Structure formats: C-alpha cells, structure tokens
Amino acid sequence: MPPRAKKSLGQNFLKDRNIAARIAAQLHIGPDDWVIEIGPGPGALTRHIHAAGPARLFLLEKDHHWAREHHLHPLAGTPEAQVVLTDALLFPWERLDAAHPWKVIGNLPYNVASPLMWDICSRAPGLVRASFMIQKEVGERIVAAPGSRQYGALSVWLQCFTKPEWCFVVPPHVFTPRPKVDSAVLAFTPRTDRPDAVQSKRLAHVLRLCFQQRRKQLQGILRPHVGGDASALLAELGIDPAARPETLSPERFIALGEAVAMSAIA
C-alpha cells in the first residue's frame, strides 16, 4: 500500500492520467531539452514527461520515501533520469548551465508555490519554458492585469520575467487527498527583455515598499525612501503621484525601481 500524502509537505497526488498528460504537454518537450520535475511523488507526471523524450530528466524530491522509490524502481527505460533528494526552495537555480535548454514542471504544493515560481522564473539561466499546477486563486493573481483586485507583487514580478499563459483548471476530485479548492495549470515563457541582476534587486525592493502599503498613494509610500521630492520623481516617470501601486504596469515598476535606486544614490 503506497504511503499517505504528507500534509506537512503539502502533498496532493494527481491520479488522473489524462490531466497528467495535458500538463506535461504544456511544456512542449523536445529531444534536446533538459527537464526538471519538482516533487514527482508517485510519478503521475513523470511518465508523460519521459514519454515525450527529453535529453535529460532530473527529479527533485524532498520526500525521502519517493526519492528512494524513484532510485530503486525507476520507470522502465529511464536511465537518463536522475533523482535529487532536495528541497526545491533551496535548490541553486542560478547554477543551471545556460548552455542547455531547461524546462521546469511540477504539481507544486500550495504552500510553497509562490516563492518557488518567484525564484525559478527570475534566477534560472537557460530556462526556456515552465509549466506548473498551482492553486487557482494564485494563478488568477499571476495573470491579473493592472488595476484589478488580484494584481500584486507576484503578478508584477512574474510578468516582468515571463509571459504567463493560463492553460486550464483542474478540479479537486482528481487528487488524493482531495483539496478544498480548484487548481490551475499555467505555462511560462521567459521574456527577452527581462530585468538583469541589478534591476531585479531594485524591482524586488520597490515591490516590497509598494505592496506592503498597497492602499496608500505612491507619493506617500515613497516619500521616506527617496532623497528628493517623491511627487517630482513620479511625475518625471509619467506616473500620477496620487496613484496606488496596483495601477502600475510591470514596465512602470521596473522604471520606478531604477528611479528609486538612483534617488538614494544622489
């Protein structure tokens, strides 16, 4: 009898093969791709990933039981699959070899999905596509447009680094144990104009400032943090000083991050 899902790890195992196949298909796997699966568990997605024929397959598994199972009982004909016992939150995504086309996929635990996507989409060199199943509500936040209720720091960050695509909704009954909410599958394609390392730090800083006080006006949020007049700084960027954070586009946030950093130096 297989072990029960561990609540402490946020495990909800997918049991529908057709949906597993649809999720794997969103990754558009080719023969040259190096694929990382996060949290393979019993291997519902793994089978379809392998069937697509990637050049290499790496399985990141935090659960000792499932890591051991994949070591001892690998899927038939998968000598190229490598099992890594690790927490994906601690994995050094920035060390991926950019010489290879990397694709990342996973049925992500709800409790760590946001920080995982934040790190992977901004730090992984060579990333060409990602596909994740996450809580539907989080997915709605990721694709939210400026001015909407769901739009926030996660929306801005992921839209600055990738082009998120809403794929489809997954109902609770196809999991064991059954979650209380719907899930959604999203795919991510990195942007060619994504922020560099310096811009990323500045963007993260200004997002923290703004969305910790999202109901305040931008001029009030920034006033304690800029060397000059916050209203003038915003006006120079073409931003209404009385605007609130959720009204700014991702591109405006990148520009604002640069301006705030420069004002602190001046």
UniProtKB/Swiss-Prot annotation:
Record SMART domains: rADc
Q: Which reaction does it catalyse?
A: adenosine(1518)/adenosine(1519) in 16S rRNA + 4 S-adenosyl-L-methionine = N(6)-dimethyladenosine(1518)/N(6)-dimethyladenosine(1519) in 16S rRNA + 4 S-adenosyl-L-homocysteine + 4 H(+)
**Mind naming one GO cellular-component term on file for this protein?**
cytosol
InterPro entries in the record? KsgA/Erm, rRNA_Ade_diMease-like_C, rRNA_Ade_Mease_Trfase_CS, rRNA_Ade_methylase_Trfase_N, rRNA_adenine_dimethylase, SAM-dependent_MTases_sf
Residues annotated as binding S-adenosyl-L-methionine are N12, L14, G39, E61, D87, N107
Q: For this UniProt record, give its keywords in alphabetical order, as a comma-separated list.
A: Cytoplasm, Methyltransferase, RNA-binding, rRNA processing, S-adenosyl-L-methionine, Transferase
Catalytic activity, EC: 2.1.1.182
- What is the purpose of this protein? Specifically dimethylates two adjacent adenosines (A1518 and A1519) in the loop of a conserved hairpin near the 3'-end of 16S rRNA in the 30S particle. May play a critical role in biogenesis of 30S subunits.
- Cross-referenced PANTHER family, in alphabetical order? DIMETHYLADENOSINE TRANSFERASE, DIMETHYLADENOSINE TRANSFERASE-RELATED
Can you tell me which family this protein belongs to?
Answer: Belongs to the class I-like SAM-binding methyltransferase superfamily. rRNA adenine N(6)-methyltransferase family. RsmA subfamily.
What protein name applies here?
Answer: Ribosomal RNA small subunit methyltransferase A
The organism named in the record is Nitratidesulfovibrio vulgaris (strain DP4) (Desulfovibrio vulgaris)
Gene that codes for this?
Answer: rsmA
